[in-house]
Structure formats: C-alpha cells, structure tokens
Amino acid sequence: GYGIQLSVNSIKLLNKIEFNKFKNDKKYNPEKINFYSIKNSKKICDLNISDFNLEDCKYTTLKRSDLIDFLKRDLKDLIKTNHNISQIDQDNNKIKVTFENNQFSECDHLIISDGVFSKGKNLIMNTNAQPKYNNTLAIRGMISNPSEINCENISLYLGPDFHHVIYPVNSDRDLNFIAIMRYKLSKEEQKNYI
C-alpha cells in the first residue's frame, strides 16, 4: 500500500478512536522534512516537524492500507462501504447523508476524503468541479529500504518540471515515493486518467 502522511491534528482526532494503540512497527514518526535540489542532491534546508508534535500526537506516516484496516476493524459498524452519496443536508447540528440506495445516516460530524475532485465536496458546495489536466503527472510507488536514501525523515527533492518526495511508512523503513513531473498527454491519453 502507498503511504499517507497524518498531521498532528489528524492524529488528535484518530486518538479518540484509539489510534494511539496502533502498532508502532506499522507507523513512523519522522522528525524533519529535508529539502534538496534535484540537480545536485544538495540539501537546501530542513523543517523540524517534531516541533509541532505533542506527547501523544505526533506527525505520522504509514501505509494507507494499514490505516484503512485499522478503521475497518475498529469502526466496522460505523463505516459504510459500497455506498454512493446522493445528497448531503445540514440542519441545526445534525448532518443527514442520503445514499443512492435511498438509505441514509445522520451524524454530528462528516469527514469527506474522496479525492481532489470530490463528489462529496461538490454536493456540499453545490458545484460540479471537474479535473483539468495541466500537463503534469503524478507517479507513486514503494521502495524497500535503499541504502543511499535517508530513511529517517521526509526527503523532498525540488527541481524544474520535476519534484519528488520520499518518506518512511513503518519501522522497517519501507519508503513511499511520489513524483510530480511535467508531461503532455494527448486528449485520447487523458481519457485513461480522468
């Protein structure tokens, strides 16, 4: 599974459902983000993200699949899978989510995490945002503990027309890799990605 980075604020929320008991070997708490030039791999600067940590809420990286497994296991009765939202209404302090199968749920809080061009966001904002290709591609994958890469922290390489970030996702120091690059796709090729 690909990686995910969780801020101190998101960990604070997850700890309310006992994320603090999540296995330590399946997550990682990097201390810094190191910024490098992609041209010569020289370090530009760093940001000590551990300065923002609290005792029980630390900036955390892990595999998405491990986070999903945790949520499914501990919240299986509250998480709805294979449901498509058709309507979101808010009245006073309650939120009513209606699904395409005409079932509904009421809640106090709603977290929408369905991507940049989110159907949920469109329903709340009453818009229909569509993706617009801007001649860039994102590539992601996993790397197993290479010796030439700093496995302790987040490494962000910056350059013209190409950036990539590498960060550990567990105590085995498996690394998540994400690259953003300029790349022009034909209209026909774009249909495969939208």
Question: Residue ranges of each PLM-predicted region?
Answer:
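Glycine-rich FAD pyrophosphate-binding loop
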Residues: G1
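Conserved N-terminal helical subregion
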Residues: S7-M125, A129-M142, K184-I194
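Active-site substrate-recognition segment that forms the wall
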Residues: N153-E188
